[in-house]
Amino acid sequence: MADSQPITPGQVSFLLGVIPVFIAWIYSEFLEYKRSSLHSKVHSDNNLVELGEVKNKEDEGVVLLEGGLPRSVSTKFYNSPIKTNLIRFLTLEDSFLIENRATLRAMAEFGAILFYFYISDRTSLLGESKKNYNRDLFLFLYCLLIIVSAMTSLKKHNDKSPITGKSILYLNRHQTEEWKGWMQVLFLMYHYFAAAEIYNAIRVFIAAYVWMTGFGNFSYYYIRKDFSLARFTQMMWRLNLFVAFSCIILNNDYMLYYICPMHTLFTLMVYGALGIFSRYNEIPSVMALKIASCFLVVIVMWEIPGVFEIFWSPLTFLLGYTDPAKPELPLLHEWHFRSGLDRYIWIIGMIYAYFHPTVERWMEKLEECDAKRKMSIKTSIIAISSFVGYLWYEYIYKLDKVTYNKYHPYTSWIPITVYICLRNSTQQLRNFSMTLFAWLGKITLETYISQFHIWLRSNVPNGQPKWLLCIIPEYPMLNFMLVTAIYVLVSHRLFELTNTLKSVFIPTKDDKRLLHNVLAGAAISFCLYLTSLILLQIPH
C-alpha cells in the first residue's frame, strides 16, 4: 500500500490556490440559486404577460453563452485589468462571481479531479492488486471492442479536401483520430495487463504518435502560416497544463510522463523549422534545406557521443528523472533513451505532410482512371505494401526488445508507411472511420497521464505504475469495468476542462493581454510557493 509521504511546497501551493477557488465557486452557485429563485417568484406574478413583454425587450440585447452567462460579461472580464479582476475575486464581489461562475466551476472541477488522483495513488483509501497477463483475455477484450465499435460507430464521411475540393480524404482528420484511438487502447491495455510480448508494437505506436506531431503541426503551419504567440501558447497549454499540475500534486518529475516532453520538443522543432524565414516556405529548395537541417540537428544531437549530454545538462532540473527502482542510472538517461527512439520519425511526418497535396492529386487522378487500370494499380500498391510489411515483421519486429530498440529509430517509418498505404488504398476505406476510436483518439493525452494514477498505481513519487487500482477486491473483471469507466470519464472531462480554461486564459488575438496573463500567473504562483515555504517552516 501507499506509504506516507512528506507534504511538498508545491502541494501546499496548490491547496492555497484551489481552496479560495472552491469557496468562490460554491458562493457563486449560491448567488445564482438566489437570483434564479427571485426570478421565478417575479414570473409567478399575475402580471405575467406584461413582465414577459418587458423581458423580451431586455433579451434582445443579451445573448446567452454556455453556462447561462451573457456575452457582455465575457467581454467585461477580458476588458478589465487583471489587478481589478483579482481584487474582485478575493473580495468575493457578487457580480464578478456570477459573471464567472462557469470558469470557477471549471477550475474547481479541475482541482477536484487532481485531488482524486492523489487519493487514488498516494493514500490507502483505495486498494491495489497485481497485474496479470492472459493472452486470450487480452485479445478477447480488444477484438470485442473493435466489433462493438464497427457495429455501432462506423460512419461515412464526405468532407471536401481543401487542396483538391474533392472527397479524396487521404489521411483525413477522422482517420488519424481513429488511428490514435485504436493504438491508444492497445497501449493502455499493454500497461494494464503487463503484455510484455507486444513491447515492439508499442514502440511503433509511440513512433506513430510522434509522426503525427510532425505531420499535423507541419500541415497547420505550412497551410495557415499562423506563427502567432497565441497559437504557440495554446499548443504549450494543451501539451503541458495537465501534466504540470500532475507533477505538482503527486511530486513527480516531468519525465515520468515522457510522452509530454517528447511531443513538446518535436512540436517546438517543427515550429522553429517552419517559423524561421517563414516567408520562404513556398520555395521547394528552401523547404528541402529546412528538412535537411532538421536531419542534421538530429544527427549531431543523438548520433555524436557526448553532444546530447552537453546540450541538455542545463535542463536537468526539468528533464532529469530517477526511477526509484533504478537509482543508479544517470538523471538524463530516460530523456536520452525516450527522445532518441523517435528522433527521426517527426521529420518523416513533416515530409509526408509536405507531399500530402501532391499525393492527393495523384489519388484523384487514380480515381478517374478506367476500372481495369485503377484496379491493377491499387492491387500493386496493396501487394507491395503487404510484402514490405511482412519483411519488416520477419526481420525487424521479431527481434528481442534490446536489439529491436537499436533498429527502431531507423525503421519505424516502415510499418507506419505500410499502414498508411493499406488504410488509404481504396476510396471506400478512406470514406469510413469508427467514431468510437476517433473519440478516444481525441483524449489520448489525458488517458496517457491519467492511467498512472486512477487506473494503475505507483504509490511513490516517480514510481512506475506496477499495480492496478482496486475498488472491488476479489472481482478483477468487475473492478476493471468500474475503474475503466471512471478513468475514461475523468479523462474526457479533463480534455474539456483544459480547452475551457484555455479559452479563458489564452486570448487568441491580444498578445499584450496574453503576456499580462502569463506574468500574472507567474507572480501568483511565486507568491503561493513563497507562502507555502513559510508555512512549512512553522513547527508542528
Swiss-Prot record:
Q: Which residues carry this modification: Phosphoserine?
A: S44
Q: Name one GO cellular component term.
A: Golgi apparatus
Question: Null-mutant phenotype, please?
Answer: No visible phenotype on cell wall acetylation in single mutant. Severe growth phenotypes (e.g. dwarf and abnormal flower organs) associated with reduction in the secondary wall thickening and the stem mechanical strength in the quadruple mutant rwa1 rwa2 rwa3 rwa4 and characterized by reduced xylan acetylation and altered ratio of non-methylated to methylated glucuronic acid side chains. Absence of interfascicular fibers and xylem cells differentiation. The triple mutants rwa1 rwa2 rwa3, rwa1 rwa3 rwa4 and rwa2 rwa3 rwa4 are also dwarfs with abnormal morphology.
The UniProt entry's sequence similarity note says:
Belongs to the PC-esterase family. CASD1 subfamily.
Q: In which tissues is it expressed?
A: Expressed in cells undergoing secondary wall thickeningin a SND1-dependent manner, such as xylem cells and interfascicular fibers. Mostly expressed in the middle and bottom parts of the inflorescence stems. Mainly observed in the more mature parts of inflorescence stems, but present ubiquitously.
Q: Which gene encodes it?
A: RWA3
- Name listed for the protein in its UniProt record: Protein REDUCED WALL ACETYLATION 3
Q: How does it sit in the membrane?
A: Multi-pass membrane protein
Q: Tell me which InterPro entries the record gives.
A: Cas1_AcylTrans_dom
- Which Pfam families would you find in this protein's record? Cas1_AcylT (PF07779)
Q: Where in the cell is it found?
A: Golgi apparatus membrane
Single GO biological process annotation from the record: xylan metabolic process
Residues that carry a glycan: N424, N431
